Amino acid sequence: MGSLFGRVAALRALLCGPRFQCLLVRPSSGGPPWPQERTLVAVKPDGVQRRLVGTVIQRFERRGFKLVGMKMLQAPESILAEHYRDLQRKPFYPALISYMSSGPVVAMVWEGPNVVHISRAMIGHTDSTEAAPGTIRGDFSVHISRNVIHASDSVDGAQREIELWFQSSELLNWADGGHHSSCYPA
């Protein structure tokens, strides 16, 4: 599990390390702008039941990301089976599908520079005992099988998951009119 100090140091290294330098600083004015990405974020049934949806939205908005799609649904088993297809041979798969279909899920699509990697850092380790304080799972998760939230793990995975959970007509392209407090360029 590691000490609290070790987990905080690990999170700091993740956010401040060379690979994730863009999490904290803007690119130089002479460099190319960050590409806009989209990612799927889903508040799982335990997060909805515990009324954490607003907290999750607030964290992503404060980070400067733009919400371009959102819906609450009782996830159909067909979507869950496709979403978790890589886990079908795992012994916990039936329990995972049962849990994910046990209550409503709030699925969201967030847009922003480097949103896939940053959102993964924001949500924290899958195992709540390893999730650093300050991450969503570190602050709210109580068990590895009830870990509040899902976020896509790659740009390709995000595209696949977004197409699975949303119709293109459910995603909005809207301009924020420059009225944002993001540290990212408009």
Swiss-Prot record:
Recorded topology in the membrane = Peripheral membrane protein
Instruction: Using the UniProt entry, state which stretch of residues is the transit peptide.
Output: 1-32
Catalytic residues, per the record, are: H150 (pros-phosphohistidine intermediate)
Kindly give the CDD domains that the UniProt entry links to this protein: NDPk_I (cd04413)
What GO molecular-function term can you cite, just one?
nucleoside diphosphate kinase activity
Q: Name one GO cellular component term.
A: mitochondrial intermembrane space
Q: Return the protein name.
A: Nucleoside diphosphate kinase, mitochondrial
Protein's organism = Mus musculus
